């Protein structure tokens, strides 16, 4: 049944959740050498997300159709990405039509942030995650949506001059101050290295794109708040990433996650490109050469048609037998 649902979602990708997720992510266009109290356009360009035109609620908030048992759902991460795309369009054009849409997405995220243990602001998912990622219950939170909501709400706050948004941002940031065992999204390995988990379970997954998007949210919060703990979290995560980045290199493609004792899952063509754009942004922010090194290497993989074909074949086999 799982394979059947995946086939249906792919076959109907123009009307499924893939209609949103597979909209191209491009290299960011902002200025990333910023000082305190400054934010520019987001670190990757989500403006293509604004082209999503399939399902919206009556207020204009995007809905995703996962087909099968999950059906049509709100996804906090998708809403934050759509909002960041709207912000990119506003930065580029200054057209007023984007302001109302930015407001709608921001208000949804604020209205749907619930307060949990330790005062943590939670953007909860109302549907189950994939069994592969060990998320079998509704009501879970994810570092990627928590982080991207922070990034979007801070930009919306500045664009709309809605300084009250900072209250929700501060609650969301608390999820990065607590471990998964205390209601947060942070996990640690045996060496004490920090991970911001897209799928917060006991076993460390270190999904690469989710980890980095979460780091961007922490970094944005640091820029606006000057919070020393946010700076430390970002630096600790950079140390983790620099140490483990070589493990994401399959020799012909990038790896999606670092689950141990599992067959290595290659990133899809879409997410391989996301990894490249994220690493370019991290290099622009930090000037750490390792990020540029892997961005260049993985871009060469991307431009090699044989490597691309091998990655596609490997991914299809993985999805059928292991996902």
Spans of model-derived segments:
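Glycan-recognition and catalytic cores of secretory/periplasmic carbohydrate-active enzymes
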Residues: 1-323
């Amino acid at each position: 049944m799982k394979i059947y649902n995946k086939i249906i979602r792919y076959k109907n990708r123009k009307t499924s959740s893939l209609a949103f997720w597979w909209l191209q992510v491009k290299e960011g266009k902002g200025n990333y050498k910023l000082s305190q109290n400054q934010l520019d356009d987001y670190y990757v360009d989500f403006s293509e997300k604004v082209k999503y035109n399939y399902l919206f609620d009556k207020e204009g908030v995007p809905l995703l159709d996962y087909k099968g048992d999950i059906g049509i759902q709100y996804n906090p991460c998708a809403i934050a990405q759509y909002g960041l795309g709207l912000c990119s369009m506003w930065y580029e054009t200054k057209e007023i039509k984007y302001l109302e849409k930015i407001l709608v997405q921001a208000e949804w995220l604020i209205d749907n942030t619930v307060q949990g243990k330790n005062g943590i602001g939670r953007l909860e998912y109302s549907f189950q995650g994939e069994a592969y990622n060990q998320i079998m219950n509704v009501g879970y939170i994810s570092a990627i949506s928590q982080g991207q909501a922070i990034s979007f709400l801070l930009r919306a706050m500045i664009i709309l001059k809605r300084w009250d948004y900072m209250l929700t941002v501060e609650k969301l940031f608390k999820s990065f101050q607590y471990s998964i065992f205390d209601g947060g999204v942070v996990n640690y390995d045996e060496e004490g290295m920090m991970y911001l988990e897209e799928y917060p379970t006991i076993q460390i997954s270190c999904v690469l794109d989710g980890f980095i998007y979460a780091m961007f949210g922490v970094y944005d919060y640091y820029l606006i708040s000057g919070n020393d703990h946010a700076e430390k979290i970002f630096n600790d995560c950079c140390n983790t990433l620099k140490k483990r980045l070589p493990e994401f290199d399959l020799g012909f493609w990038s790896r999606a996650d670092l689950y141990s004792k599992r067959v290595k899952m290659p990133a899809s063509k879409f997410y391989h490109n996301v990894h490249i754009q994220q690493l370019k942004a991290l290099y622009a922010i930090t000037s750490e050469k390792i990020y540029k090194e892997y961005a260049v290497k993985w871009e060469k993989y991307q431009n090699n048609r044989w490597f691309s074909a091998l990655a596609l074949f490997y991914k299809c086999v993985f999805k059928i037998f292991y996902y």
